[in-house]
Amino acid sequence: MTSPLCRAASANALPPQDQASTPSSRVKGREASGKPSHLRGKGTAQAWTPGRSKGGSFHRGAGKPSVHSQVAELHKKIQLLEGDRKAFFESSQWNIKKNQETISQLRKETKALELKLLDLLKGDEKVVQAVIREWKWEKPYLKNRTGQALEHLDHRLREKVKQQNALRHQVVLRQRRLEELQLQHSLRLLEMAEAQNRHTEVAKTMRNLENRLEKAQMKAQEAEHITSVYLQLKAYLMDESLNLENRLDSMEAEVVRTKHELEALHVVNQEALNARDIAKNQLQYLEETLVRERKKRERYISECKKRAEEKKLENERMERKTHREHLLLQSDDTIQDSLHAKEEELRQRWSMYQMEVIFGKVKDATGTDETHSLVRRFLAQGDTFAQLETLKSENEQTLVRLKQEKQQLQRELEDLKYSGEATLVSQQKLQAEAQERLKKEERRHAEAKDQLERALRAMQVAKDSLEHLASKLIHITVEDGRFAGKELDPQADNYVPNLLGLVEEKLLKLQAQLQGHDVQEMLCHIANREFLASLEGRLPEYNTRIALPLATSKDKFFDEESEEEDNEVVTRASLKIRSQKLIESHKKHRRSRRS
């Protein structure tokens, strides 16, 4: 959409014949020429004078009644625009007058504050007397302390100046906002007047603006809702932060205890892993040793067998040789006797060889080389066999007894089957009653458990509250109380009653101390101190206080010749710079607190 200034320039740039042929363009040009004059405010002139446009229109439109009607409409529009301009001029004059009144009032306040500062700087005694009159309860404390009284008063003065500057800044911002809203209102009125005669682009623009306004309102409502939710969350978190320290302490203690347990378990695990590795190495070494010894025994047995066979063959050859040699010399009787003796000797040797082979197999099977250990194993096997026989007999007796019990139970089952349905029904009723009683007991147990949990939660909340209250009253000491000089054990069973008694004694003592004082006056004093402390806490770290000298001359702080120059109002640029610095200091302070 083109601006009204562009349309006015294009309308003024047309030749005379084009202006006569397009009266609507001249109407738009005149409307546009009135709009920027309204926006520029006072002291601005219209694009052309009404007399010139009137004469020109009569000269060009002679004999055309439509031109007269257009001229009349243009006169009406010009009158409306002139009325809008006058209204805007009057509102601007009223704003200027109001601002001048505000400036004069602020000048008066500044002069009064300067006079007050001059009175305060006249002497130490006067300042001390003023401070003592203002704070009667601090009279013994500030009687002979002029420096501290001046510092305190200077601090109060600086705080008041800060509050005044903040209020001035808010007033300036609201005035600027009011001017912007008035300007927007005038623009909306002009656009509405123009939209009544034009139903094309301006109407579309109005609808778009209305849609945007509705969207902005919806977003604003949503933002307000989100803000309320965040405020509720903040309040909830503030309530939770009261008990957060105790919970954090308990959780930290639990974490430390768990870390110690984890370290101990790591040590035990490492020892177990080392023992496992050692056992594996020993087992592997024993297996390798066993395999080597077994192979060694097998080689030794095979060598012994070979030597025995060789000796046997040599003996047989020697026997055959001796038999052939003595065969001719001996008789048949002697030959038979020698044969019988040799046969007996061979049988004995063969039996000895068989016994050695069997004994070697037994050694291979048992893995022992000594005869005594082999005998002990066979004796142990005999004892084991006897124990197994005993267990076998006992198991047979148990089996017989169980068979008898089974037969007896089967007979009882048959008796129960044919004993009738009355017993079964009664047993079912008893079972149903027992189940109902069980359900009641379970419900009662669940209710008791819930009550116990609620009581435990209430006890925990009370304990946390009492601990918080005790931490607030830690500076109060009760010398003649029950708990004087005693330290309460949090792990003891009577910790909560003892803590309640201690808090009660401290509160009673505090109440007794407050009986002779004015409560309202003390509350006001505490509120002022908390406000000042909060302001001091919000200052950044690099902000330092410079103490003013006590003995100063009048010309050093108050110059009557430059009084007129000091009455000048702070400019908008300097006010913007100061407000920007103040906002940046607050942001830095918040970041430092978060970090």
Curated annotation (Swiss-Prot):
Assembly: Component of the outer dynein arm-docking complex along with ODAD1, ODAD2, ODAD4 and CLXN. Interacts with ODAD1. Interacts with PIERCE1 and PIERCE2; the interactions link the outer dynein arms docking complex (ODA-DC) to the internal microtubule inner proteins (MIP) in cilium axoneme.
Alphabetized InterPro entries for the sequence: ODAD3
Function of the molecule: Component of the outer dynein arm-docking complex (ODA-DC) that mediates outer dynein arms (ODA) binding onto the doublet microtubule. Involved in mediating assembly of both ODAs and their axonemal docking complex onto ciliary microtubules.
Any GO CC annotation of this UniProt entry: ciliary tip
Gene: ODAD3
The protein, known as: Outer dynein arm-docking complex subunit 3
Keyword Metal-binding included in the entry's annotation: no
Region entry Disordered, spans: 1-69
Keywords: Cell projection, Ciliopathy, Cilium biogenesis/degradation, Coiled coil, Cytoplasm, Cytoskeleton, Kartagener syndrome, Primary ciliary dyskinesia
GO biological process: brain development; cell morphogenesis; cerebrospinal fluid circulation; cilium movement; determination of heart left/right asymmetry; determination of left/right symmetry; epithelial cilium movement involved in determination of left/right asymmetry; flagellated sperm motility
Lineage: Eukaryota, Metazoa, Chordata, Craniata, Vertebrata
Subcellular location: Cytoplasm, Cytoskeleton, Cilium basal body; Cytoplasm, Cytoskeleton, Microtubule organizing center, Centrosome, Centriole; Cytoplasm, Cytoskeleton, Cilium axoneme
Keyword Coiled coil: yes
Disease linkage: Ciliary dyskinesia, primary, 30: A disorder characterized by abnormalities of motile cilia. Respiratory infections leading to chronic inflammation and bronchiectasis are recurrent, due to defects in the respiratory cilia. Patients may exhibit randomization of left-right body asymmetry and situs inversus, due to dysfunction of monocilia at the embryonic node. Primary ciliary dyskinesia associated with situs inversus is referred to as Kartagener syndrome.
Coiled-coil region(s): 94-327, 385-473
